[in-house]
């Protein structure tokens, strides 16, 4: 009886799946949108490229073939037009409806709570963001600048000086991980990891870096819960444990910070505690958000810095111009600070161009259209459609940028010959009321570190890092070692 049922069920499943594929291709409300037939038939097309780490390149290829909107799944549309940022991620208005976050993409943390980025209700998110917002304001950042400078000075005058004396190639990504995680640990919880002192990762950070490589697998298993049970081998038990350990380590640090006096500690948690509505977040909510900040507050900065250095090393004239701007603008290193760096036009142009070519988040985060549909870039998109801007593809599109694959910082300067570029297509920190809350902090950390490095040292490329930017994403970049050398100026 069991065998007979099994032989009967399998054809039914096959017939049902085949009928669904035919419907998706020929009858589905999205059938008129261009894209591969296989992508229209099944969501597994999208997940094949995602799990392979090459979805960003495949999306770029498809947009070159089909234009500014592509159907990348049965219920999934990818956009690259600049207007899509506002239409997809912007707030609701009287003339345009709001798209909500996709619950099939954003999972709760292992403690069952949702961090700010994964809150599905936009009003709830707005309430939580208001509590955290003062901690990430320019005023707070200026108050925290001495904390940042303490670690940056150690990086400049201890770690890099030793490496300059050794005159051997070293992995800049590893060194930046040590520096940025030390800074973020101090900024968030008044306790550095001490990794610059050791020039090595502590267990928590090793755990986190391993867990990040399996983020795409986790999202796949979330979306295909039943199928995921059959494919659980995609995420080894050790990777699951690493993710859980990251949350546990974060919780332990938060609990330790909670026991300290707010009056004696100046950090993000101190600003949070001072907010009149801080009590809306219980300890489990704080654990979840601290886990988020330890990733979002570090990964974007490390990615942007390493990408900027690589691109400058690949383009010596740009490096020479930036070095000249920095060294001509300051008479001493201590004059390099948050306020003075904002006025360096070529530095900011180089940073904008690096973020265009190597955005820290190469894929747009999905939203879902309301039940009665929405209008995106002039297209009437049916309800319950998953929509997003493919960041990397948008920034590499010839329809948005001239010399789209070339590092051209001058495109961000006046009268550069790139006035026809659709620069608003590049939104490395997203757009709208749910954009990156730590954008200002990231920009400052990037500026202060690259400016002080180039004020003190000459950077040299190592042959081992040729082709470094050809990376996979899961969905964040899987960064390889970036081997460089430094010399005292």
Curated annotation (Swiss-Prot):
Pfam families, A to Z: p450
Keyword Ion transport assigned: no
A cellular-component GO term for this protein: membrane
Effect of inactivating the gene: Produces smaller amounts of AM-toxin than the wild type but still causes lesions on apple leaves.
Cofactor(s) in the UniProt record: heme
Broad class of where this protein is predominantly found: membrane
Gene Ontology biological process terms in this record: biosynthetic process
Localization per Swiss-Prot or TrEMBL: Membrane
EC numbers: 1.-.-.-
Ranges that cross the membrane: 292-312
Induction of expression: Expression is up-regulated more than 10 fold in toxin producing cultures.
Pathway it works in: Mycotoxin biosynthesis
Residues bound to heme: 436
Membrane topology: Single-pass membrane protein
Keyword Protein biosynthesis in record: no
Protein's job: Cytochrome P450 monooxygenase; part of the gene clusters that mediate the biosynthesis of AM-toxins, host-selective toxins (HSTs) causing Alternaria blotch on apple, a worldwide distributed disease. AM-toxins are cyclic depsipeptides containing the 3 residues 2-hydroxy-isovaleric acid (2-HIV), dehydroalanine, L-alanine which are common for all 3 AM-toxins I to III. The fourth precursor is L-alpha-amino-methoxyphenyl-valeric acid (L-Amv) for AM-toxin I, L-alpha-amino-phenyl-valeric acid (L-Apv) for AM-toxin II, and L-alpha-amino-hydroxyphenyl-valeric acid (L-Ahv) for AM-toxin III.
Membership in a protein family: Belongs to the cytochrome P450 family.
Protein name: Cytochrome P450 monooxygenase AMT3
